[in-house]
Amino acid sequence: MRKASYFLLLLLACMPVMAQQAGEQERNKQIARSFFEQVLDQGRFDQYAESHATDFVAHAGDHDATLEEDIAAAKEERKALPDMKVKVNQIVAERDLVAVYWTASGTNTQAGMGFPATGRKIKSDGMTLFRFKAGKIYEEWSVWDMLSIMRQAGLYPPPQ
């Protein structure tokens, strides 16, 4: 009985911490969703300051991008696909991490991202993992199928 009482007391003591973590995770998920819906889907690049830390880093292959470089890349994507729509399919959070599974689609009507304008419709799924610090997006890792994008744009031959 005594052990059960101690266990119950310990469990009750931990509940506020678990509730706080759950609240932070939900807040972080909402920040990530708002970033995708407002910045990437609607092109409201001024909203970066609302969601991202000033010392943000995007880990992109062989180059870590600063906040300014990440904003420039997002603007370049919007330039190449002016009608781009970005849909959040799924969001999962654990501790200070938020994973977003998304779909982007649009028409490549202007040169951008190193590609000429092709007039073709493009659709791609991707995954982004954010790390949060002090309520802001502090780090990002993103992956998507660039080969599929190039094939849809007619810039790379389809498989034989």
What are these regions (language model features)?
Residues D96-N108:
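A short hydrophobic beta-strand element
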Residues G106-A134:
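Exposed beta-sheet edge and beta->alpha loop/turn motif
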Residues A32, R44-A49, F56, D70, ...:
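Hydrophobic pocket/interface hotspot
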Residues F45-V98:
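A solvent-exposed, acidic/Ser-Thr-rich amphipathic alpha-helical stretch
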Residues E139-Q160:
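Low-complexity, intrinsically disordered terminal/linker segments enriched in charged
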